[in-house]
């Protein structure tokens, strides 16, 4: 079996390798691919032009005095890569029946496709991290091979990020008499539009569900809408739809990612409550693929470019790599209100 063509790889990754990520599925449903390395923010909506404030990040500190507003932004370039070696094909794979060992050609195919899955997952983690931080804070940090780390700030109003103050903490309220409805309504009123979904971690859910008056108003019999069902598909182990609180869909999320140090961490910090709308106009933007082979094949404006190649030598070496230049854009960060619950 020879090398996979780009068309075969694109077909495989688009149809077989799908990793659903909660915030991307709910709030960033539209995709815009650019033929240029830069993303033109003022061309992605038919409404008010979008701009972002970009600041350098030096030694972990955001230097806003050295930043400026821009409508043209170059995304960080992501290109996870794997090497396949001959020894992997002759050794038994996990799960193989020793009495029915697969031939090396089958193992090679299985390992290559698994590598493609890992590369896709690595890129989705980058996209979801951008999406989550854009929703939580109205900004995120981004880095790439050809530039230093920067902060991309879409201009969230300070009033839309709330920390429960002294005397207002839900953890200190009476479980039998306190009604959180008033607080939730006040929070929702700060959003620039209607709020129809509340996403929270397990800590916030336990607090809310501990209030008798909250439980009495929670409608667990009404099913979730089709959009929400699509978003949480394949995430049943880490995302749970609890019901409706009035018109507010209540969702508990325990989605996680693997950090650079190899430790699994949650996307949502402890005690975080996110109020938003599933009609939010978040956009998945992608800069051009920066690969000469991609250019020769006519694959320039694309969210992904998977490739598979051999290097001639003694011995020859075989690789897979998936390239992407993602930039998650949140035109109206004030559509969301984020509460640090205490």
From Swiss-Prot:
Q: What InterPro entries does its record include?
A: Major_capsid_GpE
User: Where in the cell?
Assistant: Virion; Host cytoplasm
- Gene3D superfamilies reported in the protein's UniProt record: capsid protein of prophage domain, putative capsid protein of prophage domain like
Q: Which UniProt keywords apply?
A: Capsid protein, Host cytoplasm, Late protein, T=7 icosahedral capsid protein, Virion
One short Pfam name that applies is Phage_cap_E
**Does the record's keyword annotation contain Phosphoprotein?**
no
Oligomeric and partner information: Homomultimer.
- Family per record: Belongs to the lambda phage major capsid protein family.
Q: What is this protein called?
A: Major capsid protein
Taxonomic lineage of the native organism: Viruses, Duplodnaviria, Heunggongvirae, Uroviricota, Caudoviricetes
